[in-house]
Every structure is written in structure tokens, then in C-alpha cells.
């Protein structure tokens, strides 16, 4: 039954009235964030940073090791980090084409290396990146070198002795990696595979010293994991316009926001919403160790057209309590963790506003606890994905509540898939 049908039959069917209350409560309760959209409390998930439903945004700092060669001979091994950010879908259909979009990255060379520059009078460098390869497990192709045939070239990079040297790509705009073709099922992991840079170190005296940096991952190299399932024949997934406002992560860490599509049952009728989770997340876990999310928070997203339909039903405000947002752990313990604290997260009574999508920080201030997650004996990886969610909702200030139950997304939506090292 549709919302309109429920309305037409409400006089003779108490369940229809209950349905209307539930739907209004779910979307209306979300409007509590309207006052927070312009100035969200510290540490809450900023609504303006939440991507569209179905979008995964993130920034990753991966440890790498670069073999530095001069005239074809290895000179030294340089451990450093590659800092990469981008956008991808949270789910894929069988055989669906997809891209990693809005990509950018940088490699930072340490200050001790630039401290050697004055010895040779080195003041500038030119860089030519000939290989930047991103892999996609079980996909076709399995990897793409985005610099193949069109190397990235950076001229006249200033070298300041004793200061870190950051080489970023591209100089302007962003890059897209793809298309890849998804497998028939399972999951796809996008990963940093390889990078090669040819660098000319230039001196004030007019001579140059050509070196080559061949860089490979030295720990985990996964960027993100995407679940595959559902109906075949889906349109290519090449996403644009997602917000990317992340701070620089720590080494071996990601900072990201995943906005997963959910179907919630309220009063017997399904309602599509988005549930977003953002956090700082380690990218590897040691055998015998554990990992946790830090600065974790969530958000409920209600589309504007749903808000408008509920206003048309005669509702202007709602309230409630979120009681569950479960994380499911594969390859580790606990098997399930509810990140909503005991007593729930309150949603104060608030108005609905026509033509306005609602993004509700959960909680409206502070953060959630997620973890620790411990690898199971013999596990090669530990993945954390979004599970079911639930709330108790009320409408119009009434004392009664209506339960809202939201099943886990299908295909699976992963927050992280960490190798056990």
C-alpha cells in the first residue's frame, strides 16, 4: 500500500493512521538537524560533508617504500606515505561498470632528504610520474595505470632544505580511474598498487641529477571495499560532485564517510532512507591485536520528496529515539556491535520544512564508540560493515511511539576490510 492509499483509508483502518504517524515521525524527527546544518556541534558529522545516498568518500594515508635509483643502480630505500582521496559507489551490481572518481594524491619526502640538497646546490626539481596504478580485485581489468601514455609532469618544484617535500597529483582538478567491470558477486577491493616517478634534481649551477623512485605498499594497500549483488544491467557508476573535506589522516589510517541506502519498515510500509557513518579507521590490524574507530559519528538522511509527502499528509513535527545501529564483523569479534549507547540517541521534537532534504547528525554532538574489533584465530582479514538499525518514533508531541526497523543493506556495505598482518 502506498502512503496516499494509507491516507485514503485511514478513517476506516486504524493501521493507516498508525502508518502515517510512523512515516511522519521517521522523516520529521530527522528535521532536528535543520538548526544544526549551518553550525553543527563540535565533533558531530557535518551535514554539508555527508555525500549522497549510495556514495563512499574517503581519504587514505598508506605506508609505502620507494627504491631510489641513480643511473639504474639502487642508491637507497625510502619509507614514506602516499596520501590518496576519492569517491566510489557503496554497492555494485553484477558486471556493472564503475570508476574511482574525484581522485587526487601526494607523496611526501622527509625533511632529512631535502637537508642533503645544499651539499649539491640543489634548489628545484622536475618530476614525471609514469606509473600510478590502482587495482580492483576480481574486476576487469584487475588494475589500471592512470599515467600510462600520459605521464603527470610537474615542473620547477621548489626544494627547501630541511623541510618535507610534498609532490601532489594532479596539479589542477582531479583524476578518474576506470572503467572497471565488477564481478558477478562477492566484493571488490580498490587498492594502491604501484607508483613510479622520474625526478630531475636541478642545481643553481645548471646541472641536473636524474633519479627514479619506484614505490610499492609496505603494509596494507586497500583503499575501500564494495559489495556486489542485486540485479544485473545497472547503469555505469561514475560519481561526481561529492564533498571531500577531510583532514589529513595519520599514517595507515583512513578518514571517510559512507552513506548507505536502507529500506526501513514503519507501520508495515517500506521507506527508503540513507544512513551515513563517518570515522577515522586504521587500515591494518596485527595478529593478536585489535582496532577501533575514532571520532565516529553517524547521520540519517531523508530526501526532500519524502518530507514533502509527509507535509502533504498534514504533519509538521516529530520526535523519537534511535535505539540501534549495528555493525557486522566478518573474520573477527564481536560478531555484531550496536554503536548506539544504552538509552538510545534522542531526537527532539522538530518541524518539517518543505523542499528540504534533512540530514540529522547522530548524535547531534559528540561521537559514538565503535570497537575494539579483534581478528578471529586464523583470519586473514577483518571487515566491518553496516548492519540493521532501529528507532522508536513519535509524532506531533504525542506520548505513543511507533517502531521503525531497518534491515541491513543488500548488497553489503563495507566500512573497512583490513588485512591481518
Task: Please name every model-derived segment.
Residues 1-44:
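Secretory targeting and sorting signals
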Residues 45-421:
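Primarily mature extracellular domains of secreted and cell-surface proteins
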